[in-house]
Each structure stands twice: as C-alpha cells, then as structure tokens.
Swiss-Prot record:
Similarity remark: Belongs to the protein kinase superfamily. TKL Ser/Thr protein kinase family. TGFB receptor subfamily.
Active site feature: D331 (proton acceptor)
Gene: Amhr2
Cofactor: Mg(2+); Mn(2+)
Reactions catalysed according to its record: L-threonyl-[receptor-protein] + ATP = O-phospho-L-threonyl-[receptor-protein] + ADP + H(+); L-seryl-[receptor-protein] + ATP = O-phospho-L-seryl-[receptor-protein] + ADP + H(+)
Segments crossing the lipid bilayer: 145-165
Residues annotated for ATP binding in this entry: I207, Q208, E209, G210, G211, H212, A213, V214, V215, K228
A Pfam family the protein falls into: PK_Tyr_Ser-Thr
Name of the protein: Anti-Muellerian hormone type-2 receptor
Length: 557
C-alpha cells in the first residue's frame, strides 16, 4: 500500500484565494487532448508547476492518476464543471475506474476543499490483487504483449480525451446560473447551434479586453460598430448576454443598442461568437470623467440618463403587445457605462444581468433566471458591490427586489463619481482629479476584505464635500439623494425610478411642481424603496418629468 504522496508544496500566490471560490491544483500531463482549463481561472505561480485554478462552475476538485507497477503518474488535476456526489469529501480518496493494462490502473477522486486534489492516499497496488503468483513475462518490443500494452496505452489517451471533451461540452451547453443544459429563448434547444457568419464585418482595433471577451471597433455594412468577441470556450457567457439583449422591448436610448449576433474573427484568429453593438466613440464613463470636467447641466444629464436607463432595466411592462421583464444588471461600474455624443449615458455589459421574477412572465424566459443561491449572489466589480453582497446577507426569499436594491447602491457610487467632476459644485470651479468610489480611502485595487471592513463593518461611504450643499446651483437634495441610495439597510433605499424623479426635480424644479399628479415634488420624501403602488404614485410620465436636459459643456481636465 502506498502512503500519502504530497505532489507539490503550494505556493503563496496560489493560496491567496477568494473565500467563496474553490481553488484546486491544476495539472494536465503532456499528450492529453483537450483541456479543463476553461472551467476555472488558472493561478499561474511561475513558468512551471505548481499551478492552481479557481473554479467557475463548482466547488469540487478532481484528480486522475495512473498506477503502473506500483508507481503513480499524475494525468490530470483541476475543477469539475458541477458539484457531484463525492464532492463533499474533505480529502482525495482515489477510486479505481479502469485497467488500461494488467499492470496498470486508472484512479480518480473528487473532493470539496481548497487544494484537496494535491494529495492522494491509499492507492492499492495495481494489477493482480490476490496472492503472489508467477512473475509476469517481460514485454519484448514487437511481441504480442508489447503490442497489447501499446494499444492499451493508446486506449488510455483516448479515454482521457473523451472525459475532457465531455466536461467541455457540458460547460459549453450550460446556461449561465443554471446547473443543467437548457435552451435559451430563441436558441431552438440545440447546444451545437450554428451562428450566422458575419462576412461583412470588419475589425479595426482593440478598445477593451476583459475576462471573457475582447471588444473591437469595426464596421458592419459601412456603419461603425463595437464588436464583442468571445473565444469559443466562452459560449456560455455569449449566450447569456445575447439572451438579455434579445428580449422583446429591450430598446432604450440609455441602454447600449444591440445590432446583431453571429460568428467571425479578426484575420487569422479562430472564429468565435460575436455580439455587434453600437459604438460610443467617447468611451466609458470612467474614461470620460478622467479626461473631462462638466458643468452642472452636463453632470445632471449624465446622472439623469443613467438613472433613467436603470429604471427602464428594472421595470416590468407590456408595450405595444410586447413584454419586457424586469432585469437586474448586477455589474454597474463606470467601465460598463458608455457616453453618447450628447454626453448622456448608455448602460452596457449585460453579461451578468438576470431576468427577475414577474407576474406576467412567459415561461420561455425561465432559462434566463438563476437556479440556486450561488448564481444569485454572483456579482461583478467588487468596488461597486452592495454591503449585502459583500457579506452574503442578500435576501434570497425576494431576490428580485434585493438585486434591484443592490443595483441602486452601485448607481449611487456612479452618481458620486459624476458629481465629483462637476465644476459648478466647487467654489473655485476646479474639481480635483478623478477618483473611483472608495479610491481615496482604499486605493486603486481594494480587496474584498478591505471593502467589507469599510462599507459593511464601519458603514463608511465616499466623502460628500460641504460645497455640494451650498453651491450657486443650490442642489439641496444631492446629499440626501446619495444617502438614500447607498443606505446600509437595503429596504431603506430608493428605487431607480425614484432616483430618476429626484434628479428630474433638480434639473426642472418648475416642471416637477407643475405636474403634481405624475411628479409629486420629484418624490423628495415619500418615495418608497419598494416598487411603486397606488399608495405611492411615484411613476413619472415620459411627457412631463423626463424631458431632455439641454446640452451643457464638457471641459478638458
């Protein structure tokens, strides 16, 4: 019997892991076809092993070993694509699965603790497990035994390849947030769906690189467009985002415009799934605020359009016979908001968006909803996460409303960033250089623990200068608005619609007072955090409250 074999001493770089993501040892022997690397994020500790991998789809590690003549050879280690029986084990307990040759046995294990697949124990000897018998004949090159072992070796490689390909196929078919392959609306239920080839699409230059996609500037039929190119391994992320963009009625001035979806690639690179979207040459909100300051009119336009876009996303409505469900964005950040030519905002990057449960929702939209607490609690950029996401106390009983409230917290941080670059809110009309929310307190790359300590334990928020409450523009409601949006109690926060109302009242105080039925004082006091009802008619009419702000000016910083 073999004792416990420690394969590697895990490096510190691999040990610094997220408390909510399983981290496993990652290894694939040379010659193994396919890879399970796409089931997680590889932690590269150097030019060679050891490496770790943070699992994306499960909390389960696995290992595959080949025991030949009493000697163990590692074939594969990594993440499984789902939590399966055996994942509850704290240790790697190998189980024999196949006998590629009389003297060789293939063992596998699964376990559910960090790096548990680094060590394996109690591997029984391979081959004959009975009493000692006659010595095995030696394999002579070219002889029948040698040929049999060669064929069995080839069989072993093919078997491992089939296992890997099966894992990858399951992962590719997975709808984001779910545990089983299910069709998305309009997909026809076919995992191997053929996407149209976008032959007329031309790629120009890379404008942004992310974890699952690269965004290019390009042209389609003469129109300048943005191309979000996904690698073939990220088909699940592509399908999830496309499903949200293709929902009936999801067309709005302050939501990034979806044009089409298909497949293609720049030049010699492999063809992959693509989303073609409207191009916004002014770039992201973060980029714009870094480069420019704005006057009061421009700042209000950005703030009001951002709130209007989020209110539209959150709203459930029927319009012209078409149904639009409520949608939670879950990844609002100044990188995911784009600036239009008129300096208003358009919300983009719907890769983590979730369709919310609604009273009139058609059954066909069910696959776009999560199927478990882990999928609901998954969120985007840490800096903008609501306190209830940082400490995992989000209300899972009414998760739809809870996610909307979390979005409003993120909205408040974006409003603060916009207002921090407003020249009219400073006595000298010279705002300081742009900083992200919490950058002054925690720096440019805060950890989840640092954010938890500041935003949850200490209940601190970005500083609101006193000049914001006594400037010539008289924005008396700014401090109250922000505090009502980033309140530590999610139930005390405003809805996105009410934020829209209050900003409209700041932009047009005379308009808000002229329409008491549709705009009750811009909802300064009585707008509930829960969705509007007959008792709280805080639902503006497009023709009265939501007039466009006249275009202001932006000053180069």
């Amino acid at each position: 019997m073999l004792g416990t074999l420690g394969l590697w001493t895990l490096l510190p770089a691999a040990a610094q892991v997220s408390p909510n993501r399983r981290t496993c040892v990652f290894f694939e022997a040379p010659g193994v076809r396919g890879s399970t690397k796409t089931l997680g994020e590889v932690v590269d500790a150097g030019p060679g092993p050891p490496k770790g991998i943070r699992c994306l789809y499960s909390h389960c590690c696995f290992g595959i070993w080949n025991l030949t003549h009493g000697r163990a050879q590692v074939e594969m280690q990594g993440c499984l694509d789902s939590d399966e029986p055996g994942c509850e084990s704290l240790h790697c307990d190998p189980v024999p699965r196949a006998h590629p040759s009389p003297s060789s046995t293939l063992f596998t294990c699964s376990c559910g603790t960090d790096f548990c697949n680094a060590n394996y124990s109690h591997l029984p000897p391979s081959g004959n497990r009975g009493a000692p018998g006659p010595q095995e004949p030696q394999a002579t090159p070219g002889g029948p035994i040698w040929m049999a072992q060669l064929l069995l070796g080839v069989f072993l490689v093919l078997l491992l390849s089939i296992i890997i390909l099966a894992l990858l196929q399951r992962k590719a078919c997975r709808v984001q947030g779910g545990s089983d392959p299910e069709p998305e609306p309009g997909s026809g239920g076919d995992c191997s769906e053929e996407l149209p080839e976008l032959a007329e699409l031309r790629f120009s230059q890379v404008i942004q690189e992310g974890g699952h996609a690269v965004v290019w500037a390009g042209r389609l039929q003469g129109e300048m467009v943005a191309i979000k190119a996904f690698p073939p391994r990220a088909v699940a992320q592509f399908r999830a985002e496309r499903a949200v963009y293709q929902l009936l009625g999801l067309q709005h001035n302050h939501i990034v415009r979806f044009i089409t979806a298909g497949q293609g690639g720049p030049g010699p690179l492999p063809s992959g799934p693509l989303l073609v979207l409207e191009l916004y040459p002014k770039g992201s909100l973060c980029h714009y605020l870094t480069q420019y300051t704005s006057d009061w009119g421009s700042s209000l336009r950005m703030a009001l359009s951002l709130a209007e876009g989020l209110a539209f996303l959150h709203g459930e409505r029927w319009q012209d016979g078409q149904y639009k469900p409520g949608i939670a964005h879950r990844d609002l950040s100044s990188q995911n908001v784009l600036i239009r030519e008129d300096r208003s905002c358009a919300i983009g990057d719907l890769g983590l968006a979730l369709v919310l449960p609604g009273l009139a929702q058609p059954p066909a939209l069910a696959p776009t909803q999560p199927r478990g607490p882990a999928a609901i609690l998954e969120a985007g950029t840490q800096r903008y996460m609501a306190p209830e996401l940082l400490d995992k106390t989000l209300d899972l009983q009414d998760w739809g409303t809870a996610l909307q409230r979390a979005d409003v917290y993120s909205l408040a941080l974006l409003l603060w960033e916009i207002l921090s670059r407003c020249s009219d809110l400073r006595p000298d009309h010279r705002p300081p250089p742009f900083q992200l929310a919490y950058e002054a307190e925690l720096g440019s790359n805060p950890s989840a623990c640092e954010l938890w300590a500041l935003a949850v334990a200490e209940r601190k928020r970005p500083n609101i200068p006193s000049s914001w409450s006594c400037s010539a523009t008289d924005p008396r409601g700014l401090r109250e608005l922000l505090e009502d949006c980033w309140d530590a109690d999610p139930e005390a926060r405003l809805t996105a619609e009410c934020v829209q109302q209050r900003l409209a009242a700041l932009a047009y105080p005379q308009v808000a007072s002229s329409f008491p039925e549709s705009c009750p004082q811009g909802c300064p006091e009585n707008c509930p955090a829960a969705p509007a009802s007959a008792a709280f008619p805080c639902r503006p009419q497009q023709s009265s409250c939501l007039l466009s702000v006249q275009q202001g000016s932006g000053s180069k910083s």
